[in-house]
Each structure stands twice: as structure tokens, then as C-alpha cells.
A protein has these predicted regions:
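Non-catalytic interaction/Regulatory regions outside core domains
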Residues: 1-121
Length: 121
């Protein structure tokens, strides 16, 4: 369970990440797919306007990350997962028992963004 002080720290971190041009969404999400802190950039219009569908996506990503962790002993830890789509890149970064989820413009350098996020959080 994350304490209120930690949530505030992560919220501030997500807000800093959202200031980076091209970042559409930045949030800390728990292993059940629920947003702990962060959210959509106020500068963009979301491609998926249905909040329920977005929540289903978060749950699917949480499940996918959990399933991929089964190979940690043989392949090593997951540092990040990047899904390259036509309109956005989705970046998942494991963070303790939770994960950071980012939606970024496709022209951004995903590895650079991952490194910046690790520095901020």
C-alpha cells in the first residue's frame, strides 16, 4: 500500500513528466490496473475518449506485465516494454510492485523518455 506522502511525490513526478513535449499520458498504476497518481496531459485530446475502455487497457497491461515476470529468473528483469502504434507509443516501466505507464508521440525517442522518467521517479 502506498502512503499519501508517496502518492503526492508520484503525482508531482507525473506532472513533471507531462511537461515534456509529446507526452500525452503519464501515471503510476498498481498491479490491478488502477491509477494511483498522474493521468492525461491537459494539452491533448485523448484518442480513446471512453474512460472505461482506458481502464480496461490499464488492467490488460498490468496482467501482461505480471505474466512476463514469469521469465525473470531465466531472462532477467524487465526494464521497460514499448508498444509502437501508428498514433502513439505506449511505454510501460515496472516500478516496485506497480508500473509507470506513458503514452507518447511516436516521433519521441522512447529510450530517452525511459531514462528521463527513471531520473524523475
Amino acid at each position: 500500500m502506498i502512503k499519501a506522502q508517496q502518492i503526492s511525490k508520484y503525482q508531482n513526478g507525473c506532472e513533471k513528466i507531462l511537461q515534456i513535449p509529446g507526452i500525452r499520458f503519464a501515471a503510476l498504476i498498481n498491479n490491478k490496473g488502477r491509477i494511483i497518481s498522474g493521468g492525461l496531459s491537459e494539452k491533448i485530446t485523448p484518442y480513446e475518449k471512453d474512460e472505461e475502455k482506458r481502464n480496461v487497457l490499464f488492467m490488460e497491461i498490468a496482467l501482461d506485465l505480471t505474466m512476463r515476470k514469469e521469465f525473470t529468473n531465466t531472462l532477467g528483469s524487465i526494464h521497460a516494454i514499448v508498444s509502437y502504434r501508428d498514433k502513439v507509443n505506449i511505454i510501460t516501466i515496472p516500478h516496485r510492485e506497480n508500473f509507470i505507464l506513458l503514452s507518447v508521440e511516436p516521433e519521441l525517442d522512447s529510450q530517452r523518455i525511459i531514462n528521463l522518467v527513471r531520473e524523475l521517479l
